[in-house]
Amino acid sequence: MGNLSIRNASVTYPSQRFGGAVTALKNVNLEIAPGDFVVALGASGCGKTTLLSVLAGFLTPTEGEILLGGQPVLGPGSDRGVVFQKHALLPWLNVIDNTEFGLKLQGVSKAKRHEIAARNLELVGLADFHKHMIYQLSGGMQQRVGIARALTCNPAMLLMDEPMAALDALSRETIQELLLDVWDHTHKMFFFITHSVEEALFLGSKLVVMSPRPGRITNTYDLDFNKRFLETRNARAIKSSPDFIKMRETVLDIIYGDEREAGEPAEYQRA
């Protein structure tokens, strides 16, 4: 499929409250290659979700362009899967029917879509839950179904908008590790939004820090903590290592400095 390229993307909304218009994103540039796990970190209102919506094709940038494999992104498409903070699963369908729903809309045969959905449910650890209804699952399991569903149409890229924000700490850690296994298995592009500095450092192969509104990318870091986890399976040792702690403090210093400069309240999580 090729890279996803964000070129001078800006988004401006009409707003009576802010004197006619508010700029959510300003001149954002970023290159995401196949196999990159990009995590965006920034204050509430800095434009993270706006950027994800532009990548998903839900919004059109006021200026600039988004290219995927050299082709302009003009709307939603099966080449990009989206996982939201709230799972958005269909409560009247069971787990496997939810997972294969996108393939059904594409006209894929029942046998083929069942095969693909079952494979992705196995990947997220839900091989024994095909017939369960959504209300019978925990929050973490529901998000696993959401991930499996997003994978089922074989997108080039997964877009994730704080998918673990509502989970308890243990479920959150479990899903973090699951995501890295999925990333390692599929080699897809990931674009992930979070308020947690620790989560950002643990998951990302590339971290982008965004300024308060108008959202710009102020800092970019290449990371390898995720690869260390895949090699060692010891998340606690990685998160308590001196270089992880040093990077966390570096990022926090940037974030709090940006917020003081903008006069915005600090709302970041260390963990």
Where are these regions (language model features)?
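A short, proline-enriched helix->beta-strand linker immediately N-terminal to the Walker B motif
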Residues: 152-156
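Helix-to-loop junction immediately C-terminal to a conserved catalytic motif
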Residues: 56
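Conserved ABC transporter NBD signature motif
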Residues: 64-76
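Short helical segment in ABC ATPase nucleotide-binding domains corresponding to the A-loop/adjacent helical element
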Residues: 96-104, 114, 118, 222
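Catalytic Walker B motif of ABC-type/P-loop ATPase nucleotide-binding domains
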Residues: 158-161
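Conserved ABC ATPase "signature" region
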Residues: 111-129, 181
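The feature captures the beta-strand-to-loop junction immediately N-terminal to the Walker
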Residues: 41-43
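Conserved ABC ATPase signature
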Residues: 133-137, 141
